[in-house]
């Protein structure tokens, strides 16, 4: 059975590389499932978990925006930030989530950038979800 070679890369370097059966990413248009021999495309990513399926195993990578480039036998994810579950500092993510929630509450009363606080909350929640906490 054919596989896809996947690279997840950030400005800091490579986060993941391997051959998988299927890749699922969250684009700004919605979920995208990618199988071998998929048509070439480039799509912008949003905050979400990248699911990398190989047999009965599913690996997760927390991604905070970027782009996915798909070729028939290769997928490259150029992410602003990406972390494997083992690399996520759960306490730091929980603290970030709490700070973002407080900022969102203040945004209703003060002149705080609501979209920025909302994005911080989505990033922290995604990291906690991928870490399984």
From Swiss-Prot:
Gene3D superfamilies: ATP synthase delta/epsilon subunit, C-terminal domain (1.20.5.440), F0F1 ATP synthase delta/epsilon subunit, N-terminal (2.60.15.10). GO terms for cellular component: plasma membrane; proton-transporting ATP synthase complex. Its main location: membrane. Keywords: ATP synthesis, Cell membrane, CF(1), Hydrogen ion transport, Ion transport, Membrane, Transport. GO terms for molecular function: ATP binding; proton-transporting ATP synthase activity, rotational mechanism. InterPro entries: ATP_F1_dsu/esu_C_sf, ATP_synth_F1_dsu/esu, ATP_synth_F1_dsu/esu_N, ATP_synth_F1_esu_C, ATPsynth_dsu/esu_N. It holds the Pfam family ATP-synt_DE. It comes from the Bacteria. F-type ATPases have 2 components, CF(1) - the catalytic core - and CF(0) - the membrane proton channel. CF(1) has five subunits: alpha(3), beta(3), gamma(1), delta(1), epsilon(1). CF(0) has three main subunits: a, b and c. Belongs to the ATPase epsilon chain family. Produces ATP from ADP in the presence of a proton gradient across the membrane. HAMAP family: ATP_synth_epsil_bac. This is ATP synthase epsilon chain. It comes from Halalkalibacterium halodurans (strain ATCC BAA-125 / DSM 18197 / FERM 7344 / JCM 9153 / C-125).
